[in-house]
């Protein structure tokens, strides 16, 4: 299974927390970008069968209909009729009957909406331009065409209360859609919040919010299938599962990453260089050891974890022999169920600490 990620960096406004490659929308710049994107795809795509496509950003829905028509002409090379899952990211206020109908007719079958919060103060803090009323109105338009809809929610804002989080989840459940991605706010250095030296909330408060989200969503029959992702059965994100299963994927566009034929690569974040055709800035040939490490780091994000037999068949190595597994099994920081090595759900919140112990045998032995 191979996926394709396409990055559209244009936005109508810049959110205070965003650390992705983005630029304000300018029509003449979009035209140049589409030319460069087409050149990159033609030059690097090797005509393999593609199972999933994800168009993200930035804000893909900031493109006008002429831009979108050009984009979809470019990506027809991926044989859109054969794509199993095709996700397109949208901002709430960009959702119109015209846009949604266009996406539906052009084989998109999954929509991801940047909601972030239903609370007015939180939306203002994040520099989001929509309201709670907008969210409900626009999701109703989407539901005329799509059943597979995700929203993103950001929690643990410095101005946010525990009750705000409860309210956000309550409102999400009212939408009656099958997927939600919940992210604790990370204050990145070069964002608006980072420049203002905003301090994050305490780990205790963060965990309390996270624990509530997990408990409430599971109570409402959502499957907690990855650290930050919850879905009704059958609505898990196949594109993202391919990432977490250490599958191969193309990354096209400004700042995109890819992993093809044992090579991980990164595209430039410099728009001027990208428009001139200097796409890749880094290519890394992955050793077997690095590949196994990636398999563990990505696979343990999933609540199902890593199948031990599949790991052996893929690498001809026992995972217990390669990594510091046994002490963590004794500490119950890892468990084995149905031949899957995984982090227990009540420990997934400290996944990064567990991964550190897995890859640092000496320190783990001292503890």
Task: Give the ranges of each region predicted by the language model.
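C-terminal scaffold of the Radical SAM
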Residues: 1, 22-44, 51-315
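Immediate flanking context of iron-sulfur cluster ligation sites
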Residues: 1-8
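Local cysteine-cluster metal-coordination motifs and their immediate loop/turn environment
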Residues: 9-20
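Intrinsically disordered, low-complexity acidic/Ser/Pro/Gln-rich regions
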Residues: 207, 329-330
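Short amphipathic alpha-helical interaction segments
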Residues: 315-329
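A short, conserved structural fragment
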Residues: 330-339
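Minor-groove-contacting beta-hairpin "wing" of winged helix-turn-helix DNA-binding domains
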Residues: 340-344
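Short, amphipathic alpha-helical interaction segments positioned at domain boundaries
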Residues: 346-367
């Amino acid at each position: 299974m191979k996926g394709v990620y396409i990055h559209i960096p244009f936005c109508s406004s810049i959110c205070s927390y965003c650390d992705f490659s983005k630029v304000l929308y300018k029509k003449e710049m979009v035209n140049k970008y589409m030319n460069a994107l087409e050149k990159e795809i033609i030059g690097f795509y090797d005509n393999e069968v593609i199972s999933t496509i994800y168009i993200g950003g930035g804000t893909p829905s900031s493109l006008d209909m002429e831009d979108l028509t050009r984009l979809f002409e470019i990506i027809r090379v991926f044989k859109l009729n054969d794509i199993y899952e095709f996700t397109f990211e949208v901002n709430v206020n960009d959702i119109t009957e015209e846009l949604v109908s266009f996406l539906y007719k052009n084989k998109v079958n999954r929509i991801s909406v940047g909601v972030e919060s239903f609370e007015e103060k939180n939306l203002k803090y994040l520099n989001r331009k929509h309201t709670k009323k907008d969210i409900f109105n626009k999701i109703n338009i989407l539901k005329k065409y799509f059943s597979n809809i995700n929203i993103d929610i950001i929690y643990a804002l410095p101005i946010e209360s525990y009750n705000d989080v409860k309210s956000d989840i309550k409102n999400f459940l009212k939408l009656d859609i099958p997927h939600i991605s919940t992210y604790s706010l990370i204050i990145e250095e070069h964002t608006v919040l980072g420049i203002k030296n905003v301090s994050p909330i305490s780990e205790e408060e963060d965990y309390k919010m996270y624990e509530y989200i997990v408990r409430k969503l599971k109570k409402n029959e959502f499957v907690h299938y990855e650290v930050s992702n919850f879905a009704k059965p059958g609505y898990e994100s196949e594109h993202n599962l391919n990432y977490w299963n250490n599958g191969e994927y193309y990354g096209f566009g400004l700042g995109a990453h890819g992993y093809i034929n044992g090579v991980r690569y990164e595209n430039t974040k410099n728009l001027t260089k990208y428009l001139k055709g200097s796409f890749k800035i880094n290519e890394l040939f992955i050793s077997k050891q690095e590949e196994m490490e990636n398999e563990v780091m990505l696979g343990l994000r999933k609540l199902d974890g890593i199948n031990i037999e599949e790991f052996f068949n893929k690498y001809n190595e026992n995972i217990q022999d390669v990594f510091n597994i046994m002490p963590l099994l004794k500490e119950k920081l890892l468990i084995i169920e149905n031949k899957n090595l995984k982090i227990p759900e009540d420990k997934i919140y400290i996944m990064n600490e567990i991964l550190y112990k897995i890859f640092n045998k000496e320190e783990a032995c001292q503890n």
